[in-house]
Amino acid sequence: MAKPYGVVIISHSKDVAKGVHDIIKEIAPDVSITHAGGTEDGRIGTSFDTVNEAIESNEADKVYTFYDLGSAKMNIETVEEISEKEIILFNAPILEGAYATAAQIQMDEKPEVIAANLKTIEIK
């Protein structure tokens, strides 16, 4: 059964994005998890188009997004301006934040509990 919340991983590296995706999919098989890493031409970096595709292709209407560096966050915020999805952005470590969130979504945890837990690992 599809969950109402999904997880989106955004990294400057396609290998990092795919690796985080693979790790969290193991513990959250029912959660829609999408990712984008690198630029369209395979270089290190991020782009609006790949970030937009990762967010829009997620099956959930509400997505928690996790990123590695500043321009990834900037692209998420830009997509947020045009997307009809509810985009939830925390400044949490990409692996730990995504893993903890996906596990809690898998267990049908309430969004306010997920948010409270993410705040404990948030990077300020």
Curated annotation (Swiss-Prot):
Residues 4-124 form the PTS EIIA type-4 domain. It comes from the Bacteria. Transmembrane segments: none annotated. It catalyses: dihydroxyacetone + phosphoenolpyruvate = dihydroxyacetone phosphate + pyruvate. It is an enzyme of class 2 (transferase). The active site is at 12 (tele-phosphohistidine intermediate). GO terms for molecular function: phosphoenolpyruvate-glycerone phosphotransferase activity. Keywords: Cytoplasm, Glycerol metabolism, Kinase, Phosphotransferase system, Transferase. One of its GO terms (cellular component) is membrane. Its EC number is 2.7.1.121. It is found in: Cytoplasm. GO terms for biological process: glycerol catabolic process; phosphoenolpyruvate-dependent sugar phosphotransferase system. Pfam families: EIIA-man (PF03610). The EIIA type-4 domain is phosphorylated by phospho-HPr on a histidyl residue. Then, it transfers the phosphoryl group to the EIIB type-4 domain. Belongs to the PEP-utilizing enzyme family. Homodimer. The dihydroxyacetone kinase complex is composed of a homodimer of DhaM, a homodimer of DhaK and the subunit DhaL. Unlike the carbohydrate-specific transporters of the PTS, the complex DhaKML has no transport activity. NCBIfam families: dha_pts (TIGR02364). Component of the dihydroxyacetone kinase complex, which is responsible for the phosphoenolpyruvate (PEP)-dependent phosphorylation of dihydroxyacetone. DhaM serves as the phosphoryl donor. Is phosphorylated by phosphoenolpyruvate in an EI- and HPr-dependent reaction, and a phosphorelay system on histidine residues finally leads to phosphoryl transfer to DhaL and dihydroxyacetone. This is PEP-dependent dihydroxyacetone kinase 1, phosphoryl donor subunit DhaM. The gene is dhaM-1.
